[in-house]
Amino acid sequence: MAEQESLEFGKADFVLMDTVSMPEFMANLRLRFEKGRIYTFIGEVVVSVNPYKALNIYGRDTIEQYKGRELYERPPHLFAIADAAYKAMKRRSKDTCIVISGESGAGKTEASKYIMQYIAAITNPSQRAEVERVKNMLLKSNCVLEAFGNAKTNRNDNSSRFGKYMDINFDFKGDPIGGHINNYLLEKSRVIVQQPGERSFHSFYQLLQGGSEQMLRSLHLQKSLSSYNYIHVGAQLKSSINDAAEFKVVADAMKVIGFKPEETQTVYKILAAILHLGNLKFMVDGDTPLIENGKVVSIIAELLSTKTDMVEKALLYRTVATGRDIIDKQHTEQEASYGRDAFAKAIYERLFCWIVTRINDIIEVKNYDTTIHGKNTVIGVLDIYGFEIFDNNSFEQFCINYCNEKLQQLFIQLVLKQEQEEYQREGIPWKHIDYFNNQIIVDLVEQQHKGIIAILDDACMNVGKVTDEMFLEALNSKLGKHGHFSSRKLCASDKILEFDRDFRIRHYAGDVVYSVIGFIDKNKDTLFQDFKRLLYNSSNPVLKNMWPEGKLSITEVTKRPLTAATLFKNSMIALVDNLASKEPYYVRCIKPNDKKSPQIFDDERCRHQVEYLGLLENVRVRRAGFAFRQTYEKFLHRYKMISEFTWPNHDLPSDKEAVKKLIEHCGFQDDVAYGKTKIFIRTPRTLFTLEELRAQMLIRIVLFLQKVWRGTLARMRYKRTKAALTIIRYYRHYKVKSYIQEVARRFHGVKTMKDHGKHVKWPTPPKVLRRFEEALQAIFNRWRASQLIKSLPASDLPQVRAKVAAMEMLKGQRADLGLQRAWEGNYLASKPDTPQTSGTFVPVANELKRKDKYMNVLFSCHVRKVNRFSKVEDRAIFVTDRHLYKMDPTKQYKVMKTIPLYNLTGLSVSNGKDQLVVFHTKDNKDLIVCLFSKQPTHESRIGELVGVLVNHFKSEKRHLQVNVTNPVQCSLHGKKCTVSVETRLNQPEPDFTKNRSGFILSVPGN
């Protein structure tokens, strides 16, 4: 039941009518048409009235409103039925089909396009490129087929002159992966002749109006439509179709689908050749047939890539083989014209079939493996010509109306007859509803040996000249007593029928008078073999492939081909069988008037269509019947999770009992009936509620399964990780053990080696032991060092420690650290170094020891110092374990300044061989000096000074910062300055000079 619409628009579902009667049905249909509501439901059938105007109800917003919704949730629409078919296909993996029926001009083709548009819009949410390509090609194929298969008729500006059934293939996710198109009975006679007020196929007009000047010149065409005999009837007609614009649309669509440029060019050449064929005129000179305008033959030969003489011969002669003899039989003027027209019709029909085949080659599913990709399901869309009643109804209308009888029979079988039969078979209480079964009309046309088609085939196979009048006579004799057949001979008082020309069939849609003129010829569908050989021998490979039977030898005897009517009958039977195997959804199209007006609702015209479409009977069956039925097993399989009594498995005696328990649990027992093998649900709402409950439970089931599966995965991962960690642990243990064993092997006996293993190369450790290797090497180096110093006297150990400290601080930063000599330390007390003054210095040192109570002398030396006033003087420094003294040697080593060592923050030295050193203090009163020695001259003592001070600070667990830079940064009473070192060749001894940034220490060059 449809919802979401106000009652001012009438009943959205005819099932909701207060009384089921034709007046109420028509009143509701008219009201909805006048209010712009062109769609109405009959349960799951959509009734569509052609609005004859554009409506803004097919956009993206509307698509989103219907996507995934149930039928009753939204107002009636084509999108609702399309979504229902799509959901049924996706949910139940069931092939579905949408059958669009109605008479010519009722809007079937437009409906099929909107359905395709909707399916394309709601699929492929992941935007897979291949799926998008397939969707695009399926949509584009519509406009190509319309161009070559549709035409303007008196009833419809875009009338389908062929039948089309398209299968859209979907993968297991519901995305389109391909398709296949079947075409039925192209009205090829329209190529050569049209009724007044009608046109030939759109393709001819599009080429002439839309082709460029250059293209038309290459095809020897001109834009004037009246210049071509085959289309001049419709040349003067005013049409709402923009042929020039459509030409570009079709050309672009062919390119998108995958037609190669040479294939598209061949299509245009064939169209041009047909137009030129129509302009050929024949005459007879004596007994010789001639072509009046021979130049046109050359143009046709050029366009068909054949030789001019071969084209001319095929048009004027017919090759006849009698035994081994081959005879060229001349045509009469009439026979030549007939052959020309048959040739034009055949070329166009082959072209159309080739276009369909080419599209199928491109869009068909390839390399689809159900074991890998899952089940391949199908939605079929049938857009076939509607019921036709013209002023002059010929063979084509006979076939078209037979097709509609077959489709009506299918509707009756599936919707009316089978439905009622199933209720009786399942034991469901049911009141029979009468309906007209058109099986008798179908049998009248197609019955073996007795039907009209069988009689027509017999007439075509008779030896000798058989006329259409003879065929009508056969119909009269064999079908004279049939209640749905009549002719003037059978009903002499019926003056509507013409003697020896007309017969009438009482179709389900109304009485139709057919003219037998042309029935025999059109059924034989004769085309001389000469034309087939002509095109098979074309140098154009596309044309050649269209005519494979042309390769047969002239003398080869072939089986009589099936007639056009029999071929069509067989294709209709196959189509109906195909549709019957799928779950059908119906769109019943109604034409509101014959004037193509958006304002007129012709009650009589519409009532007639409602009657013959059986819509009122459809409403009665729907109101009395059930919306859904399913076997107990399948129903249980789908919905068992919504009841605790059936999930995960039931323990009841049968599936039927389990289904009853499930329905009672949900509270739907008043809306169902239980058959012998199936459950029947009356209203769609109950089914949709079941679907909602199922969807809710599926979320919980999925979450439960996810939880269990994630737990399983976590346990599996834990076990794998634990096993991996065990392997890693054992492997690391193995690598560590191997490494330790290798170290032990290599360093075995190092105690007895002269260098205590210095030359032994360490093995490469595993990554995990790299830091351990560093620690191990440190331990080894300490051990080796301990072995080396064992032989040294205890008095030398402080000097060794100082040298080590100097190396740690200065190695790689200064060249000469004085490591090779013995470090004297207290050079001021050394007689070799200061023989004249050592005697003076020693008493001063002793007095300072008594006064300041220092324990050890760390370093003493003569220096040259510079102060903040840029005054350079010779001084001496005396460093003990407590103080740093600056002394004046000229005044018997008088102490000029005392700096406690705890006030010392660091040392700065240069990176050269000079003896510059800056003592940094906490009060920013740095001491800048240059060490110098007297014996030997220029001895480097920087390394010694740094080593003893660093070693002393380390022993007191303090850190002394040592900087190696050039220039050296310092601070004199808070003023920042720099001391840079320069080497000068003529400099006799180190000396300080002032510059802008501080001082320069000039030292002698080498």
Curated annotation (Swiss-Prot):
For the IQ domain, which residue ranges apply?
A: 699-719, 721-741
Residue ranges for the region (Actin-binding) are: 572-594
Signal peptide per UniProt:
none
Phosphoserine occurs at 200
The residues covered by the TH1 domain are 812-1005
What does the record list as GO biological process?
Answer: actin filament organization; actin filament-based movement; early endosome to recycling endosome transport; endocytosis; protein transport
Keyword list, A-Z: Acetylation, Actin-binding, ATP-binding, Calmodulin-binding, Cell projection, Cytoplasm, Endocytosis, Endosome, Motor protein, Myosin, Nucleotide-binding, Phosphoprotein, Protein transport, Repeat, Transport
Q: Which domain of life is it from?
A: Eukaryota
Record-linked PROSITE patterns: IQ, MYOSIN_MOTOR, TH1
Subcellular location per UniProt equals: Cytoplasm; Perikaryon; Cell projection, Dendrite; Early endosome
Residue numbers bearing the N-acetylalanine modification:
2
Residue positions annotated to bind ATP are 102-109
**The keyword Transferase appears for this protein:** no
Mind naming one GO cellular-component term on file for this protein? microvillus
Quote the subunit structure annotation. Interacts (via the two IQ motifs) with calmodulin. Binds an additional calmodulin chain via a third, C-terminal region. Interacts with F-actin.
Functionally, this protein is described as follows: Unconventional myosin that functions as actin-based motor protein with ATPase activity. Plays a role in endosomal protein trafficking, and especially in the transfer of cargo proteins from early to recycling endosomes. Required for normal planar cell polarity in ciliated tracheal cells, for normal rotational polarity of cilia, and for coordinated, unidirectional ciliary movement in the trachea. Required for normal, polarized cilia organization in brain ependymal epithelial cells.
This protein is called Unconventional myosin-Id
Show the taxonomic lineage.
Eukaryota, Metazoa, Chordata, Craniata, Vertebrata
